[in-house]
C-alpha cells in the first residue's frame, strides 16, 4: 500500500510515518515544507529515524505549489496532517498563513484527488471546532469555534464533506484532543512548561490554571489514526480521538513537580483569547468503529515527554 502523509516532519506526522512503516507492505511518502512554529532543526530531528528507511520517501515541498498530480501517482491512502497550528498566533495579521495552508492547500489536495483513485482521505481536525462546551462532547455536538484557527479547521471539515458529496472523495475526519508526548511542538503547553522547569525558570500559566484538557498521548493518537486503514465503512464519518485522562493545567504542573522531584515557581498571565475553559472527548464512536482504547496515563506520558525534553535541551 502506498501512503501519503502530509506534515510528515511534524509532531504527529513523524510518529505516524514510523508506525505505518512497521507494516512491511507499506510504502510511505512524506511531504513537509518546514513551516509553522516548530524550528527547522527540530523538524529535521523528527525525521531522523525515517530518512534511512528504504520504504520512506521524503519530499520538501509546499502543498500550495507542489505538483500534486505527480505526488498522488499510485497513492492509495492520504493522511492530511499538514496545517498551521495553534490558537494564540491565529489572530490579527498572522491569519493569512492559516487561511492559505489550512484551507487553500487542502482544497488543492482534494481537487487533485478527483483525478486519482484514492481509497481513503483522512483529514486531521481538532477539538477546537467545538468551542466552549460543558461536559463530554460527541461528534454530533454543535460546532462553535472560538478562534480563527478553529474556524479554518472547521472550514476544512466542510470542504472535505462537499468534495465527498459532489465527487465521491472518500474522506474520514478525525478530531484530535490535545496530543502530547515526545516531539510535541515548542508552542504547546506541556513542552513550554517542561522546558521552563528544566531551565529553572518560572512556569507561565495563562489564566488561573483551572482550565482542563482531554490529553491524548502520541502513541494512543497514532493507533487511532492507523486504525482507519482497511475500513471502507468509515468513509464519511467524523471521529473524536481523545485520551485516557483529563486534568487541569495546575494538576499537570503538580505532576511535573512530582516527576522531576522539584517544586516549580508559577507566573500567572492573562487568559489566551480563543481558548475554551475545558475539553472532554466522548470517544464512544472511536471505541466502536476503530476499537480505539487509549491506555497511557498522564503521569506516564509526561514522564516520557520530560525525558525527551531533558535530552533535547541538555546543556542549554
From Swiss-Prot:
User: Which top EC class is given?
Assistant: lyase
Question: Pfam families, per this entry?
Answer: Epimerase
> Is Oxidoreductase tagged as a keyword?
no
Gene3D superfamilies in UniProt: NAD(P)-binding Rossmann-like Domain (3.40.50.720)
Q: Which SUPFAM superfamilies does the entry mention?
A: NAD(P)-binding Rossmann-fold domains
| Key words, A-Z | Lyase
Cross-referenced InterPro entries: Epimerase_deHydtase, NAD(P)-bd_dom_sf
- Give a yes or no for keyword Lyase in this entry: yes
An example molecular function term from Gene Ontology annotations: lyase activity
What residues does substrate bind to? 126
Active-site annotation: 149
What EC designation does it have? 4.-.-.-
Organism domain of life = Bacteria
The family classification in the record reads: Belongs to the NAD(P)-dependent epimerase/dehydratase family.
Q: What is this protein called?
A: Uncharacterized UDP-glucose epimerase YtcB
